[in-house]
Design a protein with these regions (language model features):
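Flavin-dependent oxidoreductase catalytic cores
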Residues: 1-192
Length: 192
């Protein structure tokens, strides 16, 4: 804010709870465990502190490196797995709170439980999905199947990982359902 001015919006990706049982031990939905990282009581105080420090929005999820699947829920995680925690945190701040991670946000936004929803993987699957929603073409949307095979480089063929090099930072993301994602220079039709 000192550099860009007070009217420049600053948001923070904020994990409400760590969902971590211990070093390299993430918790699963519905599991009874003792939180080793940030718990809800700490998060309630931290969210208010972040607002007072000047953040204009909290873009929330759950998880840590040891429980990464909360921030990027795969198909086996329940839909709206972060919603209750994020909606709870909204009560402690006066700035917009966005919820990320595999969700259907319409009812939660309409009810005022959250202010918005964060999406990333769906844009890899279909970069035009918002336009298609706005134009009543929902049936034309190529959906993210939550597989992590392309976007997280987790697919292997005969023991060989996909062709994404760690140094490929300009075309880092891939998508299992959209071969063109971040590969426009590689996969294209060249007029002859």
């Amino acid at each position: 804010k000192k550099v860009c001015g007070q009217d420049f919006p600053v948001s923070l990706r904020y994990s409400v709870e760590s969902k971590t049982k211990g070093f390299r031990e993430g918790a699963l939905p519905g599991e009874s465990f003792t939180e080793a990282g940030r718990d809800m009581a700490e998060s309630e105080k931290a969210a208010k502190y972040l607002q007072d420090a000047g953040y204009d929005m909290l873009n929330c999820d759950n998880g840590t490196y040891d429980a990464w699947y909360w921030a990027h829920p795969p198909i086996y995680m329940p839909e709206n797995c972060n919603l209750e925690d994020v909606a709870h945190i909204r009560k402690f701040v006066d700035i917009p709170v966005v919820c990320a991670g595999r969700m259907d946000p319409a009812a939660a936004i309409a009810d005022g439980r959250i202010d918005g929803a964060g999406f990333a993987r769906q844009f890899l699957a279909d970069q035009e999905w918002v336009t298609k929603l706005m134009n009543d073409k929902e049936d034309d949307i190529r959906p993210c199947i939550l597989c992590h095979n392309g976007c997280f480089n987790m697919c292997h063929y005969k023991g060989v990982p996909n062709d994404q090099a760690l140094s490929d930072s300009l075309h880092l993301a891939r998508c299992a359902v959209n071969a063109e994602t971040m590969q426009w220079e590689k996969h294209k039709i060249v007029p002859t």
